[in-house]
């Protein structure tokens, strides 16, 4: 598409050229049809001239009719809104000129008045349109001149855009170089590899002759040449270090921008060596440490800088421009970041090695602790077994003695011995649990017992203790005490003995008083020491208070101060082996309370125990009594053939006597292998096996499985196990091994008879 000014100039000259033929045709039309006969013949005759004019008018008319179509197409295809009106005027003018030429074709021959009238009208309209077009074109000329000015302005803007595009291309090229350098630098996390990669890539990008890195010394007094791209042929020892107070060094470290060094700079001369070189530039690089990235309050630390020196060749074709210096600055920042990451990685690796060493030490210490704990537990278990087995034997023998005929006084003493031995066995179990499992939790066994019998046995034991100590003893028991209550009989008996032992240990001479009575909690509510926790009993309950008082004689004083209370733990304050705090926890577990009150004169001290017991109104059958020891009739298994397996000689002998007391025919063996061999003989007709679960060579579970497997085709004998604990784990293993019954040690005559009776009845 041609420019707009040239187009309108062409349209204007076309209008002038087309107007002249129309005027000539109009003038010549006056002699149309006349021939003076003076013209020469041939081609220039009047007829030929008229025919040529007629053909010319037709061609001109056709051309005039086609030009408006082209102008209309141009106006619709181009965005010339202010100029569309003049285009339409030119189109109308050209159409009228073409119409004038078309009508003129009919004036070269004789014509009618209508032809002349049409020609006149066409010429008149052509004159009006041409005049209007000329006026419009006159106002359009300034706009066409402004278009020329705008064209020059656009050319200037195009040149500026070309310069900006060139600058953007150069910046993009610099950014590409920086990205490439950054990518190469960050490929490694080793500081030496990072520095060498930086020097190599900068040398390729900037066409350097040499590149060097100066690091501060450990003392911080000088800069040392540590890395360089090309080794110097001859090096002076003094050129390898530069003082820290060198002007160039100070100036470089003072700013983050790159600096072009002078030709006589000591830093530049030392970096290029003996070779001739071109301009030299240098920039600082922060040497960050991992400690700078730790959280918390930032510490004031002096920043350490390295210096990167870049040397150009001597040919003079290259120099340090803004783009090159900008690339160097960006690369220096990236190198500082990469070096900081490397420092963090090195410190984390050192920390990981330290943690690994500490972890190994902890594992070693844990292993040693585990071995020590196992050794301690083994020692405690052995010590516990050494104390428990004789106690179990004594309890078994005493249970047989209870079946003998004795007078009431002997019966009371025997029951007290049994009760004391049972409490001692329970205490040994508690000590073993708390020391092995490392906890202070004790379980309670709530069952129905005779409160009157417990008080009588406690009085009997206290009388023995006070008699051995040489202290007088008196007691008073309320007649309203219920006979049958529900609670932990062993724990209550132990707490009472603990209270007595604590007081008589503090006294050398005096009188010990024991008072047991019931009390009304509502009447004593004003006393805060009596406040008890409400027990979750389904039925009625009773509150019982045990009050033990010691009165020192006038000639002796209490060994402890009157202000001393029993609230703190003291290993020597209990004759039975448990501290006062442990007793207090046991009392709180039974919904009770225990406290002490001292006399203001220091001559007496009182310990009071308040407990809640659930009442049992129905008296149980003697055969189903829940007491640990009883005097009810023992069942007799006359002729029952029993094999007894126990590796402990004393317990085996006691259990053998108990079985014989029950009327059994007993064969005792010392190991599980002997038991299995006994069943191998054809004469073996044992109906019952009583075995200990904790034997040395072969435990009771394996023996039971072997017996079941060995007698698989025959009717297997019944098996009753003896165990120190009867928790759910032991019961599950007994059920898996095919054991029919389980008796918890110590084995007494009543417990053994009841369990054998139950097993024989169920099987």
From Swiss-Prot:
- Which subcellular locations apply to this protein? Endoplasmic reticulum membrane
Taxonomy, superkingdom: Eukaryota
Positions of post-translational 4-aspartylphosphate modification: 692
Write out the entry's keywords from A to Z: ATP-binding, Copper, Disulfide bond, Endoplasmic reticulum, Ethylene signaling pathway, Kinase, Membrane, Metal-binding, Nucleotide-binding, Phosphoprotein, Receptor, Transferase, Transmembrane, Transmembrane helix, Two-component regulatory system
Q: How is it modified after translation?
A: Autophosphorylated on serine, threonine and tyrosine residues.
Catalyses which reaction(s): ATP + protein L-histidine = ADP + protein N-phospho-L-histidine
Record-annotated Response regulatory domain positions: 641-760
All copies of the Histidine kinase domain together span 382-615
Q: Where does the chain cross the membrane?
A: 58-78, 86-106, 115-135
Instruction: Identify the EC number(s).
Output: 2.7.13.3
UniProt remark on cofactor binding: Binds 1 copper ion per dimer.
Topology in membrane: Multi-pass membrane protein
Q: Matching PROSITE patterns, A to Z? A: HIS_KIN, RESPONSE_REGULATORY
Question: Boundaries of each GAF domain copy?
Answer: 190-339
Where is the major localization of this protein? endoplasmic reticulum
Q: What happens when the gene is disrupted?
A: Enhanced ethylene sensitivity and early flowering.
> What CDD domains does the record tag this protein with?
HATPase_ETR2_ERS2-EIN4-like (cd16938), REC_ETR-like (cd19933)
Q: Give an example GO biological process.
A: regulation of DNA-templated transcription
**Record's note on what induces expression:** Induced by water deficiency.
Q: Could you give a GO molecular-function term held by this entry?
A: protein serine/threonine kinase activity
GO annotation, cellular component aspect: endoplasmic reticulum; endoplasmic reticulum membrane
Question: Where along the chain is Cu cation bound?
Answer: 97, 101
Other facts noted in the record for this chain? Plants over-expressing ETR2 display reduced ethylene sensitivity, delayed floral transition and reduced seed set.
Annotated function = Ethylene receptor related to bacterial two-component regulators. Acts as a negative regulator of ethylene signaling. May delay the transition from the vegetative stage to the floral stage by up-regulating GI (GIGANTEA) and RCN1 and cause starch accumulation in stems by down-regulating the alpha-amylase AMY3D.
Family to which the UniProt record says this protein belongs: Belongs to the ethylene receptor family.
User: What name is this protein filed under?
Assistant: Ethylene receptor 2
Q: Which organism is it from?
A: Oryza sativa subsp. japonica (Rice)
From the UniProt record, report the name of the gene that encodes this protein: ETR2
